[in-house]
Amino acid sequence: GESYVLAVKPSDANLDNINGLIGLLVESDKPIAVNSGSANGTNADYSSGESGQDAGMDQLVPVERIGSEYIFVRGVGPSQVERPLIVAHEPNTEVYVNGNLEFTIAQAGEHYSIPSSFYGVTYNYNNGVGPAINESSSMHVTTSNPVFAFQSLGGARPDFGSGNTTGVPNQGMFFVPPINCQTPRIVNNIPAINQIGPDPDLFFEGVITIVTETGSTVLITENGAE
């Protein structure tokens, strides 16, 4: 039950600490649980002086469970936040985005931060309008070797009462599982989806994005009726 913590603190005097733990290899002689992330970090450019941080942390899986195909769906954060992170486990790992080779990660443990422009959509972070209905905002990523994948995305808009003007403070980060035979076919259920948040009078203006294989039939049931 004991734990061991590795942590770094970025500063203007030591900017190397910003990426200091990305790609760190952890090995043990017995099974362990590994959590990775930041309690007060940002996917924005720290050296630019952009203010605002938030929590982003998730539990990792062993290397045997990572894969080479991933789907990312954009949130409603600013472009500098909405960037997936790919961490290579093997050298010379090619990264393909939407079918095109975009980058080769030279060494194991190195990473590639994918620009948000590959989502194909951008949201104005100075208003509270969510994504448009039936608008594609996904990114398909494949790699030549298995990789660890993380996604950073933005949430509430500034005029929802956060008090900021850039949207940067409202962000999170999580580990993304690969597409494989374990990908679920049924999501059951999402209760009170139109009332996300503590205020019952505040209705969520976001959308649900469903990404499927070509030719798939998607059935949505609400209150027992399709």
Residue ranges and their predicted role:
Residues 1-226:
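Conserved functional hotspot residues at active sites or interaction interfaces
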